[in-house]
Amino acid sequence: VLIILIYNLPQFFTSTSDLLSSPFVSGLIAMVLCESAFIAEIYRGGLMSVHKGQLEAAKSLNINYAGIQKRIIIPQAMRIALPALANEFIVIVKLTSLVSVISLGEILLVGQRLYTQNFKVIETLLAVSCYYIFIVTVFDRLVTALEKWLDTGSRKARGLSDHELALLQAQPPAPALQPARKYASDKHRVTLALEGICKRYGNKPVLKNINLAIKKGEVIAIIGPSGSGKTSLIRTMNGLESLDAGKILLDDQPFLHPTDNGRPTQHYYQQAEKIGMVFQGFYLFPHMTALENVMFAPLYHHTGAKDDILAQGLTLLKKVGLLEHAHKYPHQLSGGQQQRVAIARALAMTPSIMLFDEPTSALDPELVGDVLKVIENLANEGMTMVIVTHEMSFAFKISDRIVFMEEGEILAVGAPNDILHSTDERLVKFLHNQKSALTTLAL
C-alpha cells in the first residue's frame, strides 16, 4: 500500500512528479519508510538491553557522554541487535519483490519478462531463485562471521605475551604491606567532607542533614539496616546521585553541590578521577578482557604512554591475584574474580579515595574471603576508603571509624570499640541482630 501510495503521489502533488516518477526512487522511499521503523526498534531494543550499571561504571571512571556511547553502550548494543538485523535484511530482500508492482527492475520481475520471451518458465525461475539464495547466503555467511568475531563467549583466553611479561618484569617490586596498619589520626588532613547533605526521592527523604569528614588514610565502614540510606550516601559522594541540599568538598576544593538541572558542575569533572568506585554488581564491560577493563580509563584519559598503561594494568591484576586471567572476559571469571578486576579497574586511575558499595553482597560465601583480603591489603597500604557493608566482622576489624545509619540519618560515629559498646537503643538493637557475625571479633 505504501509503495503504491508514494508512486501515485504526483497525481495529488504535481510538484513531486519529477522525483517520484522514477520507480527506483519511489520504491526506495517506500522501503526506507517501511523498514526504518523496524530497524530503529531493533536498535532501541539493543540499547535498552545494556545494563544501567555499565553506564554508572563508566561515569565513575569520569568518561563523558560521547565516550560512554562510543566505547561502552553502542558496541554492546550492536552485538545484541546483530542477529535481528540479519533477519530484517532477509525480510527486505523478500519485500523487494513487492516493489515490482511499480515496474522496478527487480530480479523476479526481470525473470518474468524473460520467460515470456523464451518460454522457459522453470529454467528461468530456477535461475532467479539461485540469485536470491546467493544474495541471502552470502550475506548470511558474512553476518555469521561478524557475529563469531564479536562473540566473546567463543574466544579462548590466551596467556601473557613476551612483550607483556617483559613490561611486568621491568616494574619495581611492590612495597611490603604494613604488618599492622596505622590508623588515621586527627592530624591527618580531610580528604572528603560532606556538609549538610540532603537527598529526596520524590517526597521521601533518604538522606537528612549528613555531615561527615573523611581523613586521608582513614577507613570508614557505613553500617545500618537495609533501606537506611547507606548506598544513597555513597552514591552522592562521587556524583552518581545529585544533591538536594548541602555540599561536598574534595581536598578542600568544591566538588559537588545542588544545581538547577541536577547535573554536576565543572568542579566535579575536574576532580572526579580522584574517587574510585566499586559496585555491588561488578559492572565490568563484557566486551573487554580483564586487562582491557583495567586499562580502559587510563587509555581514554591519556594518562601515559600505552606501554606504561599496559604495565600498570598487569601490575594491578597481579596485585589482586588475577594476572593469569588477564586475557579472560568477564563471563569466564567467577563473581569474586570479577569483583577483584573491578577493584583493579578503579585503582587504575590512582584515586585518592576508594568507595565500596557492598562489594561482597552479590558473591557466594566461599568467594567473599578473596575480595575482603584485597580490600584489607588496600587498607594496610594506607588507601582512604569508605565501605558500605553487611560484613560486620570485617567492618569492625579494619575500620578507623564506624558510621551507623538509620532512616537516612547518621545516629552514631565512632571507633569500632566505642560503637560495639554503645548504649544507643537503636544501635544496640541492630548489633544484637548481627550478634553471630560479631562473636568472632577480638577487640
Each predicted region: which residue ranges?
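Transmembrane alpha-helices and adjacent helix-loop boundaries
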Residues: V1-E164
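Helix-to-loop junction immediately C-terminal to a conserved catalytic motif
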Residues: N238
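Catalytic Walker B motif of ABC-type/P-loop ATPase nucleotide-binding domains
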Residues: M354-D357
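A short, surface-exposed alpha-helical micro-motif characterized by mixed small hydrophobic
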Residues: A395-K397
